[in-house]
Amino acid sequence: MKRIDPVAQEILRHAFHGVAEEMAVVEYRSSFSPIIREMLDFSCGLFDARGRMIAHSEMIPAQLGLMQFTLAGVLDALGPLAPGDAALANHPYLGGTHLPDLQIFTPVHAGGRLIGYAGSIAHHIDVGGATAGSENAENTELYQEGLIFPPVLLVERGRRNRSLWDLIRANVRDPDATAGDLEAQLSACRRGGERLVELCARHGRATVVGGMEGLLEGTSRRARAEFRSWPRTAVEAEGFLDDDGVTFGRPVRIHARVQVHRGALVVDVSGSSPQVRSSVNVPWASTHAAAYFAVRCFVGAEIPQNDGLTRHVRIVCPEGSILRPAFPAAVSARHLTVQRLSEVLCRALGELLPDRAVASSHVSFPAFVFQAVDPRSGRLALLTDILGGGGGARPGAPGDHAIDSYTSNCALLPAEVAEIEYPFRIERTELVRGSGGAGAQPGGLGLRRDYRLLADAAEGMYYLEQLDRRFGSAGVAGGGPGGPAVVRIRRDGGPWRTIRRGKGYLHLRRGDVVSFAAAGGGGYGAPPRG
């Protein structure tokens, strides 16, 4: 392996990251569904020939680092990909997340030799299953949640697998959008491959391959040094989901014990609840992604995000846990639990490194998918939206308002786009006054949005956390907790009715208004007196 001088290594490091970011721009500009092109629920990455992550676009932290788990499954099943191949996978028990997150990988060859892979993961608006959007917290097994793809070739040596494309189109609710978004992913991967080949032409193939290895080894050294500088004390934290979505009112525990051991960070989540009958179980790869995100928040910015860092994060968890469920447990609403796990881990690391601690951000994650026939076109429309809540306050600054916190980072769907694309009118989008936790620095405010149905009927699932005040966003150093999330509905022009269940299925009629409000963030420091 060719050794690279430090200057060339830094040039290549930033070049790899730039390629991943350019892939994301291509996908953003060519995607069909608003959940990708407006809400930015996708990520792109580069990997070496062994499938190790080299660089990742800065999009969705929940997808941070987990693509290499899926790529490992692809390579185990299919072997090294040939020129012109494109592999597709989404199996949650073979390195995937939940079924709507379709992942595509393409090989990159230079001078006749495999040098790496380009990959894209994107949340598709629908992949079939029992409910619109292929998500429902009340699901009890994976088979209800849509098409399951073990690693399979979507394109083989440049020729499309038409039977597979036809199968996909026949089983999803919006086939044009799904096919268009798959094309966008292929375009992103193609651009990534082109740019890597250009780097080889400019610097030489051996230099680029050596730069990948040097980047990972350099990151690994920095990561070990960082973790060795941390206290060896074991710290613990826990948090709760309001319930699992099936058994109303029974909290679900997420517990973590964190300790540095021999230059690695050991994250023990064995104390968490067993897997549940609903879909808030977390695939093993997503559990790792939550841990990688929390670590990313506490390590120095000079340490890149790649396999050199993540290899030093070790997770302990028995199979059968909510954070390591056994097949075929449902997982479509796994992000609710991933959010809480991320918050718990950040709180634990804040105990370990108090000078870097901040108050907790909301983990309410108000999200829903409604399907309705649009009277303007006669076509089925699938509205997906995710609302931001309050961010945690920190020393010297209040919490941010209306952010999609921790591992999510989706953008808010613009009201104008929602009203053009779907038979809904957005009647209110506003900050919830008083929802931030009290403190010397107050927590951020949650966001409320009201939707009026303009079609004859609509149905769909919704879910959100932190309706239970006991599990509000925690304050730090005397700061108060954030306010709760709220769901309301108003029918036939009558009064607002509060819905107590945070996860469920709604049937709407023309003129109904449904309102979701996210929780606020925790405050930092004791609030001023008087």
Feature annotation, model-predicted:
Residues M1-P83, L88-A110, L114-G530:
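Glycine/proline-enriched, intrinsically flexible loops and inter-domain linkers
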